[in-house]
Amino acid sequence: MISKKLSWLVVGLVVLSLLVTGCQQLQPTPEAAEAPAAAGERLCDGVKIVFFPGGPPGGPFGTVVYNGAVAASADLGADMEVYWSDWNPEKMVSQFKEAVATNPDGIAIMGHPGDDAYETAVDEAEANGIIVTSQNTTLPRLEERYKGDGFGYVGQELYESGYMLGKEAVKRFGLQSGDRAMVWGLLSQPTRGLRTKGAIDALEEAGLTVDYIEIDSATDADATAGTPVFTGYVTSNPDVKLVVTDHGGLTATLETYLKAADKGPDDIYGIGFDLSPATLEAIRGGWTDLVLDQQPWLQGYLPIVQICLVKKYQFSGLHIDTGSGFAHADNVELLAPLVEQQIR
């Protein structure tokens, strides 16, 4: 019931946003505008959409994104097919090409591979009349090129989110110049890495010594695979005061990492991104101290809405920032019921 109410609230907010901002970019007027859906008919009935939740099936972040897409498809009547990608950029591009070959009405992609990797395939899709939009990680060049054809974005502003988390950690925990921090992130990915860079910049501006570790492909797909990396780092750097996990799956695994390194909940500050049932329990237990919530359920729901609105009414692409605020021990119980339902 909560999911249903949230779903219609989100649709209402999106439509209101369109009414307010629609004059900013006019679309060619269709020869005959479609009438609103008749009673019992849903907005997206018969519209075929391919959706990318990003990670492996059952992963803590991708599951919430998927839940949002499923809710939108049920509410609007879309016929949705899902491609799971294990957070592998090369796999995302390959699967996108496969999806284009099936000629759906629209495809909602994760932007991790970047503009260069996607460009040729997106150009082909757009030339064939397939609506393409993005979530979680921006594709600035492609979004600019095809915004008038419905290419939008739903997600956080990446650099700003990372910077905000790092800055808040310094302030909240009283970290000082010379303190050691470990950032475990994805700098190698062209746009996705901006969030990692934002966190590093904020910490270095405060004078912290930052050790960076790239998340390898095995850990990207299965966060528990990174346990030896974490324990090895902590053993070699016993003075580390802060660990930043720039990945929802790794953030959900912080308690496991710390216990494997024989650390208690008060020994190292642990911060990261995104809520999940495991992260909720880690916050309650003191293992995870600060999380930036980017509301991933919306990153599933709103791209489906985007494609439906473009298909039915030729609206242009919307750019929606889902980055919300911080979750920690003092406020997480307000969100706990929704986290447990994998909505927040």
Give residue spans per PLM region:
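Hinge/cleft segment of the Venus flytrap/periplasmic-binding protein
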Residues: P30-V47, V183-W184, A202-A206, Q295-R344
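Short, low-complexity disordered leader/linker segments with a strong preference
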Residues: M1-K48, A74, D123-I130, I343-R344
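Short beta-strand elements in bilobed, periplasmic/extracellular small-molecule ligand-binding domains
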Residues: S73-D86, R180-M182, L203-A223
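Hydrophobic alpha-helical segments within soluble ligand-binding/sensing domains
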Residues: L43-C44, M92, G152-D179, G226-T227, ...
